[in-house]
UniProtKB/Swiss-Prot annotation:
Residues 91-111 have a biased composition (Basic and acidic residues). Zn(2+) binds at residues 43, 46, 66, 71. Residues 91-142, 156-192 are annotated as: Disordered. Coiled coil: none annotated. This is UPF0652 protein. Pfam families: ANCHR-like_BBOX, DUF2009. It comes from Dictyostelium discoideum (Social amoeba). Belongs to the UPF0652 family. Keywords: Metal-binding, Zinc, Zinc-finger. Residues 113-126 have a biased composition (Low complexity). InterPro entries: DUF2009 (IPR018553), Znf_B-box (IPR000315). GO terms for molecular function: zinc ion binding. It comes from the Eukaryota.
Length: 677
C-alpha cells in the first residue's frame, strides 16, 4: 500500500485495513473474511453451521437445529424438507432422524450410517477410544488432534450414558409443560447422580448409579491433578505471565511494522523469562536449560510448562484470572506455522494430560470399569451427619482407593499414579458441586416459590418491553418457562464444562487465523469455534427435548462474532454462572437463620418478614436477570442463548442499588466477580 493510500485511510479513520495490509505476507494469516460476506453452504438463519436441509416451501437452507426449531409449531410444521441426499422428509421424520448434530466428511458419513443402523452408544464409545489412541501417536501435533475431533466431537454425548438411554426409551418427551409440583425427567436423573456423588447413607449400602461408560466418557476430559514438581513449574509460569505485557504489545492497532516480528520478539522474551526464572529457582536444572542456546532444543520443557498451566486452570477456574488469557493468546500465535518457522520450528503446544490418556498410555483403562471406583470417587460431605458417620465414610473411601491402587498397579502404572487418577475424578465431582449445583438450587427455588399456572399478587414474573429496562414482553407463565429453560440449559452446560473447555482449547490452538477487531468490548480476536459450536448445539438440542417443544426465546448460539468473539470468551462467560448464582443461594439460605432480634425486626418492618423478603429477591432476579437487557444496542439484546447470561450480568452489576442489598452484605457477600489474586 502506498503512503498516499495510507494517509487517506488514516484520515478516514480506517485503521483496521492498514494493520491487516502490512508488507509482511505473514500478517495475512491474521486476516479474516468480512462479516458481511456470505459463506455458501451455511445455514441462512444462524449463519455459523453448515446447511443440512432445504425447506421446499420456505426455500431456505437450514442446519439441523434451526430447521426443527423454526418449524415446531403452526403451519410450518407441515412443510416438506429435502436433505443433501435428495430425500424428502416431513417434520417428524426430520426430527427423528437428526438426533445428532450434523457430521461432515466421508469418515463422518460412515460414522453417521453406523449410528442410524445400530442406534447403539457402544459404537460411539469404540470410535472415541480409537480416536483417543490416535492422540498418543500425535502428541507433538495439535493440528492432528483438531482434525481428529472435528469429525467425532458431535458423537461425544454431553450427558451421562444413562441420560441418553432414558431419553431413547421415550422418557421425558411427552410432558411439554413445566409443573410446579412434579419433577421432570432430567431433574430426576440428575438427582440420582447427585445421590451417587454425595451419598448420605452408609457407603456400603448403595446401588451403583453410574456405569463404567460414564467414567470412561468423563475421564477423557478430566485433567490429571498436578504433582509437587509440576506445581513448582506452575509458579514459574505464573510469575512469567504476571510480568509479561504480551497482549499489550500484540493486540493493538499498529499502523507500521511487522506483526509477525512483534510476535516473534514477545515469544522469545517469554521463553527467556521462563529460562531465567528456572535458573533462579533450580540452578542445576536451569543450567542444563541455558546450555542449549536455541529455544527449539528446549521444546519439551516449554510444552510441559504451558500444559501444566492449562491443566491447572481447567481444574481451578477461579485461578489465573488474568494470566490464563495472556497464555492462551501467546499459544494461539505460537500455533501459527509461519511463527514456528521464525522460532526454528519451536512447538509450545502438547495435548492435555487427561485421566483417560494417562491410563491408556500405561494400559490401565480397566480401572475405569471397576465397580469399586464409584465408592472411591464419592464425595464425603458433613451435612446432616454425625462425626462417627463422617469418619466411617472416610475410612471406607480410603480403603476403596487403596484396594484399587493395589489391584491395578503394574510395572507401567504405579499405585501412587492410580491414586492421583482417582483423586482427579474426585476433583471433577467437586467442580460439579461448586458450579452446577447452584443452578439446580435456583431451579428448586423457582418451583418452590412460584407456580407457572398462576401468579401471587405482587410477585408476578410478567415483563413488559420498556418497563424496568426490560426488552422482552412475557406474561407470567411464559417468563416462568423462559427462566426454567435457561437454568436447565446452564445446568447442562456446566455439567459438560470440562468437555467444552477441552474442545475450546483445540479451537483456539489449532492454528486457525483470527481477526483483531473492536467488538464494542475493546479489541478482541474473532475466531471461529467449530468444535465448541457442535457441542453447544448438541447440548441445546438435548435441553429442548427434555423441557418440551414449547421452547421460549431464540435458539441462536453466538460464537465467533462480535458478541462472543472466540472460545476463550465463551469459557470465561459461562464460568461466571456459579459466581452469579452462588451468592444468591447463600443469601436465601442465610435469611431463615437470622436470630438477632434487631435484624429480625428490621426485616419484618422493611420487607414484611423473612418469607416475603425471600420472594422479593427471587422475583426480582427471575424477572430482571432474564429480561433481555444488558447489550450495547437493541439488536444484540434479547432471548438468544448468549443474551440470557448477558441479562444476568446486567442484573448483578446493579445489585448495590437494590433495597435488599444490606441483606446480601450481612450474609457475607463481597461481589459477584470473585478474586483476581
Amino acid at each position: 500500500m502506498s503512503k498516499q493510500n495510507k494517509l487517506t485511510k488514516v484520515l478516514d479513520n480506517d485503521l483496521d485495513d492498514i494493520d491487516i495490509e502490512e508488507d509482511d505476507s505473514t500478517n495475512r494469516k491474521f486476516e479474516s473474511m468480512s462479516e458481511d460476506e456470505e459463506t455458501p453452504g451455511m445455514c441462512c438463519e444462524c449463519t455459523d453451521q453448515p446447511a443440512e436441509v432445504v425447506c421446499l416451501q420456505c426455500q431456505d437452507e437450514l442446519c439441523t437445529v434451526c430447521s426443527t426449531s423454526l418449524h415446531r409449531r403452526g403451519s410450518r410444521r407441515s412443510h416438506i424438507f429435502k436433505n443433501k441426499h435428495g430425500q424428502e422428509l416431513d417434520y417428524d421424520e426430520l426430527n427423528k432422524r437428526d438426533r445428532q448434530p450434523p457430521l461432515h466428511g466421508k469418515e463422518d458419513e460412515k460414522v453417521q450410517n453406523n449410528n442410524n443402523n445400530n442406534n447403539n452408544t457402544n459404537n460411539t464409545n469404540n470410535i472415541e477410544m480409537d480416536d483417543n489412541k490416535s492422540i498418543n501417536n500425535n502428541n507433538n501435533n495439535i493440528n492432528s488432534i483438531n482434525s481428529m475431533y472435528r469429525g467425532t466431537s458431535n458423537l461425544l454425548n454431553p450427558l451421562p450414558f444413562h441420560h441418553t438411554n432414558q431419553q431413547r426409551n421415550g422418557g421425558g418427551s411427552n410432558n411439554h409443560q413445566i409443573n410446579n409440583h412434579h419433577k421432570d425427567e432430567d431433574e430426576e436423573i440428575d438427582e440420582d447422580e447427585e445421590k451417587f456423588i454425595h451419598k448420605n447413607e452408609n457407603f456400603t449400602d448403595f446401588i451403583p448409579r453410574l456405569s463404567k461408560d460414564w467414567f470412561t466418557e468423563r475421564s477423557k476430559y478430566i485433567p490429571i491433578r498436578l504433582n509437587i514438581r509440576e506445581r513448582n513449574d506452575l509458579r514459574l509460569l505464573e510469575a512469567a505471565l504476571h510480568v509479561s505485557e504480551y497482549t499489550d504489545k500484540i493486540d493493538i492497532i499498529h499502523v507500521g511494522g511487522s506483526k509477525s516480528k512483534r510476535i516473534n520478539d514477545q515469544l522469545r522474551g517469554m521463553c527467556a523469562i521462563l529460562s531465567g526464572l528456572l535458573v533462579a529457582s533450580d540452578f542445576k536444572k536451569g543450567q542444563q536449560l541455558v546450555e542449549n542456546k536455541d529455544f527449539f532444543e528446549n521444546e519439551e520443557f516449554f510444552q510441559n510448562v504451558f500444559e501444566i498451566g492449562r491443566r491447572h486452570k481447567i481444574m481451578n477456574p477461579a485461578k489465573m484470572r488474568t494470566e490464563y488469557g495472556k497464555m492462551i493468546h501467546l499459544l494461539q500465535d505460537a500455533a501459527d506455522e509461519d511463527v514456528k518457522k521464525n522460532l526454528s520450528g519451536l512447538n509450545m503446544i502438547k495435548p492435555l494430560k487427561t485421566v483417560f490418556l494417562f491410563l491408556d498410555e500405561r494400559n490401565g483403562l480397566k480401572l475405569l470399569e471397576d465397580p469399586l471406583l464409584e465408592l472411591a470417587t464419592r464425595e464425603v460431605l458433613a451435612e446432616n451427619k454425625t462425626r462417627p458417620q463422617i469418619q466411617r465414610e472416610i475410612r471406607e473411601k480410603e480403603h476403596a482407593i487403596k484396594t484399587l491402587s493395589r489391584r491395578y498397579s503394574s510395572s507401567m502404572l504405579k499405585s501412587e499414579e492410580i491414586e492421583v487418577c482417582i483423586y482427579s475424578i474426585c476433583d471433577n465431582h467437586t467442580f460439579l458441586r461448586e458450579n452446577r449445583d447452584p443452578v439446580k438450587k435456583m431451579k428448586h427455588l423457582l418451583k418452590e416459590y412460584f407456580s407457572p399456572n398462576q401468579s401471587e399478587r405482587g410477585f408476578s414474573l410478567a415483563l413488559e418491553h420498556g418497563i424496568g429496562g426490560a426488552r422482552l414482553s412475557h406474561n407470567h407463565r411464559k417468563q416462568y418457562n423462559y427462566v426454567y429453560q435457561s437454568l436447565s440449559l446452564w445446568q447442562h452446560i456446566l455439567h459438560d464444562m470440562f468437555k467444552l473447555w477441552y474442545f475450546a482449547e483445540i479451537d483456539l490452538l489449532c492454528g486457525h487465523r483470527y481477526q483483531l477487531s473492536n467488538t464494542g468490548q475493546g479489541l478482541n480476536r474473532i475466531q471461529q469455534c467449530p468444535n465448541v459450536g457442535k457441542i453447544m448445539h448438541s447440548i441445546l438440542r438435548q435441553t429442548q427435548k427434555k423441557v418440551g417443544d414449547d421452547w421460549v426465546g431464540s435458539s441462536v448460539i453466538h460464537l465467533g462474532d462480535h458478541n462472543v468473539p472466540n472460545s476463550l470468551v465463551f469459557i470465561d462467560k459461562y464460568t461466571q454462572i456459579s459466581r452469579i448464582l452462588s451468592p444468591i443461594v447463600l443469601t436465601i439460605e442465610y435469611i431463615p437463620k437470622i436470630t438477632d432480634p434487631n435484624l429480625v425486626a428490621y426485616i419484618k418492618n422493611t420487607f414484611g418478614g423473612p418469607q416475603t423478603l425471600t420472594k422479593i429477591i427471587l422475583c426480582d432476579f427471575f424477572k430482571h436477570a432474564f429480561d433481555g437487557s444488558g447489550a450495547d444496542n437493541f439488536f444484540d439484546a434479547g432471548s438468544c442463548i448468549d443474551g440470557r447470561l448477558t441479562s444476568a450480568w446486567q442484573w448483578s452489576a446493579q445489585i448495590a442499588k437494590k433495597p435488599y442489598y444490606p441483606i446480601f452484605l450481612l450474609s457475607g457477600f463481597s461481589g459477584f466477580d470473585g478474586s483476581f489474586n
